[in-house]
């Protein structure tokens, strides 16, 4: 065996130990009992540090750490929203909060908390699948196989079909990388890239036999990590020639291990690389996974000593400004991973866990 092999093995072991020995603390969302519904679908930390929650059926929620402000249609505000199912969130440079629902797109002005529906003809009353505010202050969103571009004031700047091999595909996410390139990830499709010079989206080479769900740029390793629906996490390496669309797609065996027994492990909902340790956190259909990145490969980190036990139903994860990882969930409820050894705790309710097969925290 080569010296490089031993070096990589030692690094891998040290990486695993460094994470597991840090006393990762899991705490349930402190304001969980104040939510209008138990389940959070998406989380956003705004420019002022407040947390916003997209819920299914409970509307949009703002959390200041002590109380929850709820924006939804109810007896007091029956016509505020066409749907209380919030699908996606974004904040633009003008401090407007944009959010999609199952029946339309809305913009909230944080100066007065007034909510306006974006009444573009085609988009009105459609399910909004994804939204992204980018560096120039504009907003990109998608609904029913179409992509829409809006100014911060809510003016539609353009609309584009989200096509892959001649067929319209729904968008799972938008992503703007460090070079301000805008990417579109398609369910049942592939990758598109926006070209400002022609105001058009062009397909990018996507050799993986599974649709992309979310992507992040890894500047340190000069690649992108792409969550897929069915093939785990893929490493995407672009050509050094900016004119070339050739890419290298590397499957990551660590995210495919045990596929036959646990196929949901390869169905990824979201991922992020945390800023504190450089760990890649991955929420899949069955659990939350953690990986250390060594030599362009993912190496699993043992999470049994700090994560809730049993099967989990989670959603897309985020990192806050303090480096904590927020995990929205159905079972268990939303929880936060932090690295403060002075904080404890989670309290599993074993009786309910035994009955349901899912972890319950009190």
Give the residues covered by each predicted segment.
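Carboxylate-rich, polar loop motifs that coordinate divalent cations or form catalytic acidic clusters
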Residues: 1-362
